[in-house]
Amino acid sequence: MTVERVVSIPSGVSVTMDGTVLHVKGPKGNLQRDMWYPGIEITIGSEDVRFTTESQKKAVTSMVGTLASHCSNMCTGVTKGYLYSMKVVYSHFPIQIKVVGETLEIVNFLGEKYPRSARILPGTTVKVGSDEVTVTGIDKEVVGSTAANIERATRIRDRDPRVFQDGIYIVSRSEQ
């Protein structure tokens, strides 16, 4: 019994294999990822990419779906891109946010004297509005990690979360 997952390639996207690295090129940019796993064969056709295995082991059959999902996310990223919308919430002390190089600086959070900072990963674009932050990019994992870094930077410890609700929170994530 073989397990097979098929990912269709959208128009305007080219998919190539270089050894074990899958390269996806599209109108928004290029992505690459190492897709090697023992027992899994990757075949690139003219309109689709096939991930197959002959193994009966659960770990290998699960990995077929995982690699297919990675390929599908890469194809979506280079055609549409990913967008995370975040909301800035504060009650008493107004939070000031600005992008400084590769970090997002959060000033006056809960009236703190020193600013907090969140790392912006390469390959993402962060735009700051009055009470919103948008994170965009073509790599789903990098965009999600950057949004998580921003949310984690405003985490409040040792206080009641029902009272202290200040922070920057992810409100929606979507394809652009």
Swiss-Prot record:
Record's GO cellular component terms: cytosolic large ribosomal subunit
Coiled coil residues, start to end: none
Pfam families according to UniProt: Ribosomal_L6
Transmembrane regions listed in the UniProt entry: none
GO molecular function: rRNA binding; structural constituent of ribosome
Keywords, alphabetical: Ribonucleoprotein, Ribosomal protein, RNA-binding, rRNA-binding
Source taxon at top rank: Archaea
GO biological process: cytoplasmic translation
Oligomer status and interactors: Part of the 50S ribosomal subunit.
HAMAP family: Ribosomal_uL6_A
General function of this protein: This protein binds to the 23S rRNA, and is important in its secondary structure. It is located near the subunit interface in the base of the L7/L12 stalk, and near the tRNA binding site of the peptidyltransferase center.
Family, similarity comment: Belongs to the universal ribosomal protein uL6 family.
NCBIfam families attached to this UniProt entry: PRK05518.1, uL6_arch
Protein name: Large ribosomal subunit protein uL6
